[in-house]
């Protein structure tokens, strides 16, 4: 049982000034006698979400064996106001973190599934197309309602990005995941893998820098989401430079995708594609940079409130997590100023409550 708490301020997204209490770890709008007032005034935002990160992957794309280091990644996210993580693939079993109530909620996708030698070494479960359906079922049962495919990667025999899976295999794999009660998402940088993935009924696209006008329209019609990870897309020029000598076609592709990335995000949003904020933290990107991603979404063309929603109430709803409502688990971040008016406010949380306990 947690101690009763009291907060007051402007509750977002409704933008209504309210008194909010926390009783037994859950929100209530009924006065709780004896509750300690832990925050008065300011703006109350449903706990932030990093909708694409990798807990347990360290610098250089290697698995972290040390539990304290893995725990620190979660703490770094929490310090940024992120109270829920969508882990889009990790070779490390991070279930031990669920036993620590002061750490963010984690919604897992199991391990990446890739074709042989078509992803970062040792991170993915690598299978031939004939074994994809079985691998998807395994990861669906290991995750928390998501499966992560690698949709494209550099094919060294061709010297450029190319799809990893035949369309008919993708259709069977997505159907299998849905039978298991899981949604499916896929890493894609380029364009060629996207028609097969969308045709298979995939639920989300990660990065999506190769989206075209027709593919955006198809995503909007299907309700397929995109998590652009613009913080990671900033690395594309470096990827191109690193591959220039051996794979000039790949380098050219990555530069083109980088150049169009902002316009792609803007087009997706304007077409009605659900857009969510994810940093791709883990590996080469530090955890705790969600404010950078929200700012990047706004720079790309999302209105400030939409960019904020992509990392808060909209993302929580997408993942089945409640906001500030009667009976909901109390996850809230308080800011001194309105984050809708100044997105950089996200860098300065005043108070954080996670599962009904003050953690910052």
Regions found by a protein language model. Name each.
Residues 25, 41, 49-52, 81, ...:
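Divalent metal-coordination and catalytic microenvironments
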Residues 33, 130-226, 242-243, 255-275, ...:
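Histidine/acidic residue-rich metal-binding segments in metalloenzymes
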Residues 55-67, 116-126, 156-163, 238, ...:
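Acidic/histidine-rich helix-loop elements
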């Amino acid at each position: 049982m947690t101690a009763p708490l009291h907060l007051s301020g402007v509750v977002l997204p409704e933008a209504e000034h309210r008194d909010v209490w926390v009783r037994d770890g859950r929100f209530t709008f009924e006065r709780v006698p004896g509750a300690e007032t832990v925050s008065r005034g300011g703006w109350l935002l449903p706990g932030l979400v990093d909708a694409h990160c990798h807990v347990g992957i360290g610098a250089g794309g290697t698995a972290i064996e040390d539990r304290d280091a893995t725990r620190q990644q979660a703490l770094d996210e929490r310090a940024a106001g992120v109270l829920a993580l969508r882990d889009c693939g990790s070779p490390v079993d991070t279930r031990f973190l669920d036993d620590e109530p002061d750490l963010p909620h984690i919604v897992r996708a199991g391990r990446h599934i890739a074709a042989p030698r078509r992803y970062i070494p040792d991170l993915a479960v690598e299978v031939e197309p004939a074994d994809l359906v079985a691998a998807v079922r395994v990861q669906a049962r290991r995750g928390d309602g998501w499966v992560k495919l690698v949709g494209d990667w550099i094919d060294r025999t061709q010297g450029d990005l190319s799809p990893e899976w035949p369309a008919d295999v993708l259709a069977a794999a997505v159907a299998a995941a849905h039978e298991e009660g899981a949604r499916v998402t896929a890493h894609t940088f380029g364009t060629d893998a996207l028609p097969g993935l969308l045709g298979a009924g995939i639920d989300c696209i990660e990065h999506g820098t190769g989206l075209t006008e027709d593919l955006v329209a198809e995503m909007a019609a299907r309700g397929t989401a995109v998590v652009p990870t613009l913080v990671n897309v900033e690395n594309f020029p470096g990827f191109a430079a690193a591959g220039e000598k051996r794979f000039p076609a790949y380098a050219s592709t990555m530069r083109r995708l980088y150049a169009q990335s902002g316009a792609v995000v803007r087009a997706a949003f304007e077409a009605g594609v659900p857009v969510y904020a994810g940093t791709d933290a883990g590996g080469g990107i530090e955890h705790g940079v969600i404010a950078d991603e929200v700012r990047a979404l706004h720079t790309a063309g999302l209105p400030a409130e939409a960019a904020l929603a992509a990392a808060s109430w909209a993302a929580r709803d997408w993942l089945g997590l409640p906001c500030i409502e009667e009976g909901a688990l109390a996850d809230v971040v308080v800011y001194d100023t309105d984050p809708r008016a100044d997105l950089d406010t996200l860098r300065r949380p005043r108070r954080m409550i996670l599962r009904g306990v003050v953690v910052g």
